[in-house]
Amino acid sequence: MPQSPFFFPDTTVLINMALLGYVDHLRAFVQGRGRWCSTIAWEWRRSRDELSLHSADAAVRATCGEVLDPQDREHIDIEALLTSMREPGDPPNKHRGEAETLVIISNRADLFGRLRDKTRHRGTGRRG
């Protein structure tokens, strides 16, 4: 179990820090504990190219560290969470990065140890 939890920045954080030139500040804050899921890494690459943020790419990759891919069983939970997050008319992949990150964090004890609300029923806020 890690001494301190990993930090999972989302794409918006990465873009904003890159636009402001503050990725090094984020890296100092994360202190080597950065991680990102494959969808967030893909979203970063797409945004990097669209917004011409290539100069920040190496720092973002160093900040985020290892890319974590969903395991087979996690894909089912990701799709279920995506379904609950989507609004009518949303593109199919809207919120995929958030859903993937949440599922990976909640399913992998090695990232945060035992999560207190792991027994919480999805979408109800109830335990049990």
Range-by-range predicted roles:
Residues P2-L111, K118-G128:
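Active-site-proximal, substrate-binding regions of enzyme catalytic domains
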